[in-house]
Amino acid sequence: MLTLNVIKAIILGIVEGFTEWLPISSTGHLVLVGSVLKMGESKAFMDMFNYVIQFGAILAVVVLYFHKLNPFSPQKNQLEQKQTWTLWFKVILAVIPSVIIGFPLNDWMDEHLMQNWVVASMLILYGILFIVIENRNKQRTPKFADLNTLPWLTAFWIGCFQALSIIPGTSRSGATILGAILIGTSRFVGAEFSFFMAIPTMIGVSILKIGKFFYQGNTFTGDQSIILLVGMVVSFIISIISIKFLMGYIKKNDFKVFGWYRIILGVLVLGAMFL
């Protein structure tokens, strides 16, 4: 049983690592894949598992962008250190809407909207939005092509888009990148800022889920600890690959391919539900 669950944890870790950073909804994919790959664990554990393996994905961002995010780096001059601190304060500002809106509604969303039809609907809706906005921006020059020039108010509005991602199937990265592009950032700046916003957001949600798990009187078994560790390690490795792929891809391409993917997957899910 443990061996089979480890294999399933590896698969879910791969799904998390790829889909967390691509704008296609990691939670949506985990819900869909998890409905097929049943581990035989309690619902409380699986709800917590789907969020806790995000620690691996978060670590990937920290590792890849450590120099850029480290204000204490001796390789940075005084101006660069100041810019790094400013970036962090903008990230904190951007996270506030999710704290105010997302955290209080998180449990309600999990209970009422963590369903395949909701995931499918959001996949389709945001897929259409990606295609429409990319077509609209085809001949436009981004107003903000450098992360250091991103205005404070723009950072806050991007954070408001992140708050929308509490609906399963939306995609945290998808909502923030879409919002950033809509406001006027380049794809590259929108993606990077989305990654950095993920650090406090995902750590906060994961801690919340772990706290809820233990508050309800649950404990980890030895096997469950192994499953969690495997999921996090795999998520970390795949996230490294996923982030590098995305940042290389958007240097020459737009997000429409992800929009079409979302629409096709959403239609397939809805079709499967009604067959």
Curated annotation (Swiss-Prot):
It holds the Pfam family BacA. One of its GO terms (molecular function) is undecaprenyl-diphosphatase activity. The keyword Transmembrane applies. It comes from Latilactobacillus sakei subsp. sakei (strain 23K) (Lactobacillus sakei subsp. sakei). Catalyzes the dephosphorylation of undecaprenyl diphosphate (UPP). Confers resistance to bacitracin. It is an enzyme of class 3 (hydrolase). The keyword Transport does not apply. Bacitracin is thought to be involved in the inhibition of peptidoglycan synthesis by sequestering undecaprenyl diphosphate, thereby reducing the pool of lipid carrier available. One of its GO terms (cellular component) is plasma membrane. The chain crosses the membrane at residues 4-24, 44-64, 85-105, 113-133, 149-169, 188-208, 226-246, 255-275. Belongs to the UppP family. It comes from the Bacteria. The gene is uppP. It is a multi-pass membrane protein. One of its GO terms (biological process) is response to antibiotic. Its EC number is 3.6.1.27. This is Undecaprenyl-diphosphatase.
